[in-house]
Amino acid sequence: MSKSLQAIRGMNDILPEQTPLWRYFEGTVARLLDNYGYKQIRMPIVEFTELFKRSIGEVTDIVEKEMYTFEDRNGDSLTLRPEGTAACVRAVLEHGITGGGQVQKLWYIGPMFRHERPQKGRYRQFHQIGCEVFNLDGPDIDAELIVLTWRLWGELGIRDAVKLELNSLGTAEARARYRDALVEFLSARMDKLDEDSQRRLKTNPLRVLDTKNPDTQAVLVDAPKLADYLDEESRVHFEGLKARLDAAGIPYVINPKLVRGLDYYSKTVFEWVTDKLGAQGTVCAGGRYDGLVEQMGGKPTSGVGFAMGIERLVLLLETLEQVPEEISRQVDVYLCAFGEAAELAALALSERVRDQLPNLRLQINAGAGSFKSQFKKADKSGALYALILGDDELAQQVVGFKPLRGQGEQQSIAWDALAAHLATCVVQG
């Protein structure tokens, strides 16, 4: 196949054998968010470039090196969204849904785009589920977001594989004081910093704390600590969050180097990390951004949220073998029909069954075929049971019912009793 007809590097097709697990994960998260009172919002995947420069920060790696930006026919600079928070804030501002102090608890799902080096768990098109809450400024809502994700990990069976890391960045004023102290400390040791950290020191000093370079990490051991520069408001907020997590029985560790890669965060920041996926260990991250709405032209409005990477969490489910058996099976019952009259009856019969069992995954054989070939298809489909409809069954208005997995003899079931029988065997099963 020529290169022009291949997917773009780092942008992957999600094939039919993969989508059931994606749908299971997405459905589990959506149900949980609904139960917690969050409402879905859908934003465009393309925004004006200025939105991300104003929100994420012009000197961040995302804006400087990773965004997919282009000029449209009107001469406007547009960007494929690299993250969801800025677009969500733009939407609530544009439509005025947080005006007058209205509390909004929102969630979204969709693709994001960053021009990074593709590797396992990191792609140029990736998918996120995000939550954003506006006009609640206490630590209780920060705690709720974390408790919600903790419950999700439990439902997915991955709770033992993830760890919660917490930090507080303080207010913008506290962070500015700390930034000055950090720059002074590191500038005196510039020759000991790696090249990337030297660049970050000039553009976004707090990101030096993110470094993976062992020499720079050694320098940071004696660096000023952000916690020593927190204002009283931020200290009280952070202590309130920790108290709520302690009360809920959620374990966490304080990571003083956790700063996040986006400029808009303040006070609470958190990450859920795992050591099961190699270098790409962050599966969910978020925090508070109380100044972002005002920064983007709105009135002072508190905000807090998180985003989780679907690719990484699906990969974690597969790695830990936490894929429910029914998810990998896409068919419950396979109906084999032999002869033209049986094929006609099969379609009508299957629709009657679907009327009574709307959640039954029933597949009818298509393309005719011999008894042997149809049973081979039935087995390959992963179905639990095969239904057999031929001339003899048609004459008696019955179907053959044959278990395909495990023990059980074939038996005849009257058409009128078929739905009830399937409900017992499959739906209640």
From Swiss-Prot:
GO terms for cellular component: cytoplasm. It catalyses: tRNA(His) + L-histidine + ATP = L-histidyl-tRNA(His) + AMP + diphosphate + H(+). Keywords: Aminoacyl-tRNA synthetase, ATP-binding, Cytoplasm, Ligase, Nucleotide-binding, Protein biosynthesis. GO terms for biological process: histidyl-tRNA aminoacylation. GO terms for molecular function: ATP binding; histidine-tRNA ligase activity. The keyword Repeat does not apply. This is Histidine--tRNA ligase. It comes from Pseudomonas fluorescens (strain ATCC BAA-477 / NRRL B-23932 / Pf-5).
